[in-house]
Amino acid sequence: SAICLICEIAAYAKDNGMTLYDYLLQIYAEYGFQRETTINVVRPGKTGAEEIQAMMLNFRTNAPQEIAGEKVVKTKDFKTLIQRELINGEWVEKPIEMALGATSNVLQYFTENGLKASVRPSGTEPKIKFYFEIPVATEKGKPFTGADYERCTAEAEAKVPAIKASLGL
């Protein structure tokens, strides 16, 4: 379970003279920084459910060309199991391999700078959910400090309004 994994990580950090926070900063220094955020758009009632279906259909048939000024270079549709990637100016389709051919009503968009936006309707509530993974450029290998964490977090959060506007939210 997740608690066992975090205990293993904490033990590793302690054995190496670090706190969990120190270890997280080391991970950012090695792999770069990324901020995740979720936006929920609630649409109650029967008309809300219809709006959510229409939104998903629109995103599926009219994929954004850019998000927050960044060109979309790859899309994944886990309902149709089709991935489209922009290669040399042409969109190339290929199948998404899923265990047992399972599908899900999820769409993902990837930009040229590594931003990822995922969208799916909630299975239990009258809402559509948007998940954003926002990378922030760092100098790989350079020590990453608490001040770097604060700066990168603020930079990523500052991009959220433009991302939302690009998706019509």
For each feature predicted by the language model, list its residue ranges.
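Phosphate-binding and adjacent anionic-ligand microenvironments
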Residues: 1-120, 138-143, 149-169
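Short, well-ordered beta-strand elements
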Residues: 117-119, 128-134
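A generic beta-sheet turn/junction motif
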Residues: 123-125
